[in-house]
């Protein structure tokens, strides 16, 4: 699949060029003929003989950007100035900050914000610990916790290298749900240590978002923290993905006119996301599911599963899917299937595999940046196609879920998060797409749809109340 220029590799190059002639058009031609895309051309200084121009361009990689810069340098009469990577510029000094809600202008302000007045508030909380939600930032705070062991598609890069992702997550919490999220990058990958650290910092937060922790450790860590804490613990890589997939599948099935209990679903990938998707789809009514991993189709009799830990995710998959006892490869399993969901690796299927699926097939190829099957090829025979990419229709993106889910949990002062709340979130997200809007290229709303976070939050809040997990109907921050 050809890589298109992306704003992720956006560069601004400052150049001095002759004022007359064709120098400016030569700049544009040099970028476009090299496979880049000019997104901005700004004159920052002008004289009778010279122009200073900032050329902003999207490229496909840092190497591609370097090639284009060298081509610009070679144009006669052009003097190359500063070259800026716009993504790195956005990260200089970090992307988030702490800000005070009240100005501190004089002694009166100081004595109320800090000592001695703050002591009265401390004692009020000491007498009634529940007042911490009312009188501190706790009620609107979420810890975004990682050990850096499974960051995006980058792998085990450690806590410092994971920090830019956690900052970005915190920024999205604020942008879409008004939540104060705090990046917590732990310099340990010991499960016991992670559990103890999160338990120790939990008093300052109303929720815990686990992020980019490798499987199978993530399952144990989440389960232990849910058992130990009286605030919701949500591993977004699992459940955020699962909720968006269920919402998108709900609408895709509406497009093709099939029922969730009637379709055969084949999934590629049995890791954290795949397991969570499978469990939520099962709770939503999927009865015929088959999962394949690197060893082929998962079934109860597979040699590597006979002695597997009965509590393991893979054992759960073997015991709760594949009722027909299918064996073999992913390609064999997908023949005649109604739905394919990929959360695994690029290019595991070809166009011929999609063509061998049932009529009006649904394909969710979610591996990033390269999907399990080229979406352009899949569209030739599948009725509905979704990916994890922003440059194709129907992007499956967790940003559609985690802000609204936590907004609802925090507003309800929920002590936990459960399957019913996640099902409610998926239904609410699916319903944001109105009946007269629904079509094969629009089964899931944009992350910038203003209705999304509020709809998801409202559904989760009501589900928390119905489950008896809500303390009160809290006032939002």
Regions found by a protein language model. Name each.
Residues 1-92:
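A conserved regulatory-domain signal marking ACT and ACT-like small-molecule sensing domains
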Residues 152, 159-177, 229, 235, ...:
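Glycine-rich phosphate/diphosphate-binding loop of Rossmann-like nucleotide-binding domains
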Residues 314-384, 389-391:
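Rossmann-like adenosine-cofactor binding region
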């Amino acid at each position: 699949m050809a890589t298109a220029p992306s704003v992720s590799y956006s560069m601004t190059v400052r150049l001095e060029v002759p004022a007359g002639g064709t120098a400016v058009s030569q700049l544009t031609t040099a970028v476009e003929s090299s496979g880049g895309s000019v997104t901005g051309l700004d004159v920052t200084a002008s004289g009778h003989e010279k122009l200073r121009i900032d050329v902003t361009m999207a490229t496909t990689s840092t190497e591609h950007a370097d090639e284009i810069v060298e081509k610009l340098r070679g144009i006669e009469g052009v003097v190359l100035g500063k070259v800026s990577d716009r993504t790195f510029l956005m990260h200089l000094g970090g992307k988030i900050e702490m800000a005070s809600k009240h100005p501190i202008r004089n002694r009166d302000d100081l004595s109320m914000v800090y000592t001695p007045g703050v002591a009265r508030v401390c004692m009020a909380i000491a007498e009634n610990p529940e007042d911490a939600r009312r009188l501190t930032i706790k009620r609107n705070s979420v810890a975004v916790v990682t050990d850096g062991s499974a960051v995006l598609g980058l792998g085990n890069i450690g806590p410092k290298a994971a920090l830019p992702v956690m900052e970005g997550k915190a920024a999205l919490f604020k942008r879409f749900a008004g939540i104060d999220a705090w990046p917590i990058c732990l310099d340990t990958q010991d499960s016991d240590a992670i559990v103890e650290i999160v338990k120790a910092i939990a008093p300052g937060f109303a929720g815990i978002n686990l992020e980019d922790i490798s499987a199978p450790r993530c399952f144990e860590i989440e389960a232990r923290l849910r058992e130990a804490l009286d605030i919701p613990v949500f591993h977004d890589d699992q459940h955020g993905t699962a909720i968006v997939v269920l919402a998108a599948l709900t609408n895709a099935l509406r497009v093709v006119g099939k029922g969730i209990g009637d379709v055969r679903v084949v999934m590629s990938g049995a890791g954290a996301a795949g397991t969570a998707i499978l469990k939520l789809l099962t709770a939503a009514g999927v009865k015929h599911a088959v999962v394949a991993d690197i060893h082929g189709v998962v079934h109860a009799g597979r040699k590597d599963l006979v002695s597997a830990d009965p509590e393991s995710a893979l054992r759960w998959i073997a015991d709760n899917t594949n009722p027909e006892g299918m064996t073999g490869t992913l390609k064999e399993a997908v023949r005649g299937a109604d739905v394919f969901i990929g959360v695994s690796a690029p290019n595991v299927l070809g166009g011929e595999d999609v063509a061998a699926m049932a009529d009006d097939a649904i394909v969710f190829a979610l591996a990033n940046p390269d999907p399990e099957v080229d979406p352009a090829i899949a569209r030739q025979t599948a009725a509905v196609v979704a990916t994890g990419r922003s440059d194709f229709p129907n992007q499956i993106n967790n940003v559609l879920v985690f802000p609204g889910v936590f907004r609802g949990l925090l507003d309800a002062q929920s002590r936990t998060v459960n399957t019913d709340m996640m099902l409610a979130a998926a239904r609410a997200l699916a319903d944001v797409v109105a009946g007269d809007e629904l079509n094969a290229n629009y089964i899931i709303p944009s992350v910038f749809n203003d209705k999304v976070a509020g709809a998801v939050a409202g559904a989760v809040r009501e589900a928390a109340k119905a489950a008896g997990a809500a303390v009160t109907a809290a006032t939002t921050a």
